[in-house]
Amino acid sequence: PNKQRMEEYPQLTQMWKSPNGTIRSILDGTVFRAPILIDSIHPVVKNWKKPITIARHAYGDVYKSVDMYTTEPGECTMTFRGESGEEKTLLVQKVDGPAVWQGAHNKEKSIRSFARACFQYAIDTRQDLWFSTKDTIAKVYDGEFKKVFEEEFESYKAKFDELGITYFYTLIDDAVARVIRSQGGFIWACKNYDGDV
C-alpha cells in the first residue's frame, strides 16, 4: 500500500512491500510478457504486424530500493562495506534544503541469469532480441547490464547466426522510437522498472 491506502484502511499496520515485487525477487528470474493475438482486436500502432514480447528482469532496481526524505541542508553519501573490511564511499549529492533520496542495487549473478534467459528464449522462439538501458547516464549501473549482456551473448552468437536472428543493443529512448516504427516480431529485454513501464 501507499500512504493513501494506509489512510483508507487503518487496519494496515505498515506500508508492506509489493506482493508481486516480493514474489519476483524470490524467484530471481525473468518475466516474459507475450501478447495474445486476436483477429478482431487491432494494435494501436497500425504498423505492428507481429507480437512484441517484453522480457522483464525480475530482481532489483527500485523494487528493492530504499528511500528517505530529509528536511535540512546537508549531504548524502553511499557506503559499501565489504566482508574484507574494505570500504568504498561516494558522495551522492550536497543539498541546500529538503530532498528525497533513493538507493537501488542489483546483483551481477541475477543480471547474468536474466541475460541467459533472454538469449535462450530468443533461440527457443526464433525471434530477434533487443536490449535497452541508459548507460550514457547510469554509466556504472546500466553499463554493467550492457557489459554482462555482451559477455553472455558470446555463448549464444553461433546459434543466433545459425537461426538468422540478431541481438541488438540501444539506448532506451532510441529503443522506444524504434519499437513504434517497427513491425514487431521481436523480444524487448528491459530492466525491472523499464519492463514495468
Please identify what each model-predicted range represents.
Residues 1-87, 193-197:
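N-terminal glycine-rich phosphate/adenylate-binding segment common to multiple enzyme folds
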Residues 1-3, 156-197:
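Glycine-rich phosphate-binding loop
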Residues 14-21, 49, 106-113, 140-148, ...:
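Conserved active-site and cofactor/substrate-binding residues in soluble primary-metabolism enzymes
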Residues 51, 126-130, 186-188:
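Beta-sheet entry/capping signal
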Residues 78-170:
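Glycine-rich phosphate/diphosphate-binding loop of Rossmann-like nucleotide-binding domains
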